[in-house]
From Swiss-Prot:
Upper lineage: Bacteria, Pseudomonadati, Spirochaetota, Spirochaetia, Leptospirales
Protein name: Small ribosomal subunit protein uS9
Organism this protein belongs to: Leptospira interrogans serogroup Icterohaemorrhagiae serovar Lai (strain 56601)
InterPro entries, per database record: Ribosomal_Su5_D2-typ_SF, Ribosomal_uS9, Ribosomal_uS9_bac/plastid, Ribosomal_uS9_CS, Ribsml_uS5_D2-typ_fold_subgr
Keyword Acyltransferase part of the UniProt annotation: no
GO MF, one annotated term: structural constituent of ribosome
Length: 132
């Protein structure tokens, strides 16, 4: 019997990068060598957001996923995981692409933190102005 075909994909969000390895299996998802529930501290809404491309296509139990995520915080990492999963699932089965694209999961979210400008406290916050 031939070994299961592995597909790699990369997803990004803010400063986070997620590398996903997907292959046919039983639905086991690991993130940085931990179960996804342990890595995302059992927060159901965040876990559901991360695996939305799989639940949209109803294939949560058909593929094993091994993810490596670096950089950023929780929101960025979840967005990067979602982006990587969407790309990987489209590479493994091209017929899934229209449904995933329609939901916007293949589009890299371009929003980044705005840089701090000199003379200001933050990116846009200046010093308080007193008229008198």
């Amino acid at each position: 019997m031939a070994p299961a075909k592995e597909i790699w994909a990369v997803g990004r969000r803010k400063t986070s990068v997620a590398r996903a390895k997907i292959k046919e299996g039983s639905g086991k998802i690991t993130v940085n060598h931990k179960d996804i529930k342990d890595y995302l501290q059992n927060r159901k809404a965040i876990i559901e957001e991360a695996i939305r491309p799989l639940s949209l296509l109803n294939v949560q139990d058909k593929y094993d996923l091994n993810l490596n995520v670096t950089g950023g915080g929780t929101t960025g990492q979840v967005g990067a995981i979602r982006h990587a999963l969407a790309r990987a699932i489209c590479r493994i089965k091209p017929e899934f692409r229209p449904a995933v694209k329609k939901e916007g999961f293949l589009t890299r979210d371009p929003r980044m933190v705005e840089r701090k400008k000199y003379g200001l406290h933050k990116a846009r916050r200046g010093t308080q102005f007193s008229k008198r």
